[in-house]
Amino acid sequence: MGKVIGIDLGTTNSCVAVMDGKNSKVIENAEGMRTTPSIVAISDDGERLVGQPAKRQAVTNPERTFFAVKRLVGRRYDDPMVEKDKKLVPYKIVKASNGDAWVEADGQTYSPSQVSAFILQKMKETAEAHLGQKVDQAVITVPAYFNDAQRQATKDAGKIAGLEVLRIINEPTAAALAYGLDKTKTGTIAVYDLGGGTFDVSILEIGDGVFEVKSTNGDTFLGGEDFDMRLVNYLADEFQKEQGINLRNDKLALQRLKEAAEKAKIELSSTTQTEINLPFITADQSGPKHLTMKLTRAKFEALVDDLVQKTIEPCRKALKDAGLTAGEIGEVVLVGGMTRMPKVQEVVKQLFGKEPHKGVNPDEVVAIGAAIQAGVLQGDVKDVLLLDVTPLSLGIETLGGVFTRIIERNTTIPTKKSQVFSTAEDNQNAVTIRVFQGEREMAADNKILGQFDLMGIPPSPRGMPQIEVTFDIDANGIVNVSAKDKATSKEQQIRIQASGGLSDADIDKMVKDAEANASEDKRRREAVDAKNHADALVHSTEKALAEHGSKVEDSERRAIEDALSDLRESLKSDDAEAIKTKTNTLAQASMKLGEAMYKQQAESDAAKHAAKDDIVDADFTEVDDDKNNKKSA
């Protein structure tokens, strides 16, 4: 069995780790970095860039550079959160035929699962390069507060990337695994996870290798991206006041503002003041305009204070659901890059009444935990039991549009629960089961996961038929629902797939696209390798021809020069096969030149040897003077 890798698929950055003996190890990518920006770009010539190369060109290619796409995963186009994002990002968010939010570049649409798959492919390649073997299984993390549609979309992304997703694991739970694996830590902990796009808090009980999640809460649209946008809006407003130009209308300027905001935010975690300097940010009739501004930590904290405060209520709800007070929490573990912000640490300290634990790397701990879970599934990590929970209540719509819960939030998974319902009208021969997830009392206010019909109910007075509805949640938090008429034993069941979501046909098409892209990437790589090889041969042949060309026949020299000319011409194209053919032709033609060079070398060596043979070794006899000298008395 090959290695199973652990992947933290983040909003801003992603990370991959693997078990190395008894320890989990983060793997560096091709650029030598331990985390990879979760950014995908389409270049002018249609090449797909992922990670750091995509981030580097974002300023000059804002409309075809997709970032923070995780926030769109499993969301509908008309979702209020998507509406909010549409105003803030320079790339196009469009409505797919199934009503989901997708992204578009150059008329080509991509689902968020597909964009996530490009990032997962990069993680897969990073692991394969490190391990020297093919990787096709993974554990992938998601925010604890992700609903069923978002979890399913993440699993789809893994499939598109060519990975069998053995387990979807919650990010705070993964962090707790990494924190508590050494078995010495026991007690109750809170994991406060403020990442690039999402916020989660989980309360866990740890002891004797058992990691039991007591409760979880969060906000899937709150993270570092929101902090960045606050600063972007502030900078744009200040510039408009000074210069009368709205930078939000210029996508290129907006991308530069975003990069500057992210940089300033990071710097203000370790310094109390920073300077934002963006020369030639725009221009008008009077000439170019520059943006220069000093920003203090206090000002930045004031701008984002309400965002930090938004993390408090989920923490209180999680404590309440776990039946605990803040004082009963033994340790608070900080996860996610945003927890480096002093203001965030201060709020956590005030809320829990203790200094938060900073002994884990907030950018890497989730991937490390995912790799540990991969080790558990592979049998490499023993005596670890993970008991997670479902973050939101699950139920169906009943008479009057009421949401009737079948599985309450924070129920340990996997789990299976049933409840018996009946018909609302006389002689009703079919029922529609509408499945929802959420905490509101009316079904319409919650997230609909899907619906199906149970047909063929025998005619009876209302309230007589007994219809048993069963919810089954697997260890990934993904839901299956069945309905059974107890009188006829007729049953209908579905794996919940949101009214949007990707169909199997969509996924198959995207898998094929990904494979085709992998072939295209391979072709490009082969062309580059062939060019490098050809360039080296051209250089060495030209040098040899200049130094030793006189030692071959004129016809042979002309053949070499012709082959050189042909190869130089083929180097102008990207046709790897043509380049390889011309390279072989030149290699064959220049063999005579090589023979002449070796012949000259051999003659030179022979001459040196002959000169050495002319040297006469002198015979000598050693005389022992002591024998010839007599001792005197």
UniProtKB/Swiss-Prot annotation:
Compositionally biased region (Basic and acidic residues): 605-615
Pfam families (UniProt xref): HSP70
Gene Ontology MF terms: ATP binding; ATP-dependent protein folding chaperone; unfolded protein binding
Modified residues (Phosphothreonine): 198
Keywords: ATP-binding, Chaperone, Nucleotide-binding, Phosphoprotein, Stress response
Statement: the UniProt record of this protein carries the keyword Metal-binding: no
Induction trigger: By stress conditions e.g. heat shock.
Biased composition (Acidic residues): 616-625
Residue segments, region Disordered: 515-537, 599-633
Family according to the record: Belongs to the heat shock protein 70 family.
Known role: Acts as a chaperone.
Protein name: Chaperone protein DnaK
Organism: Rhodopseudomonas palustris (strain BisB5)
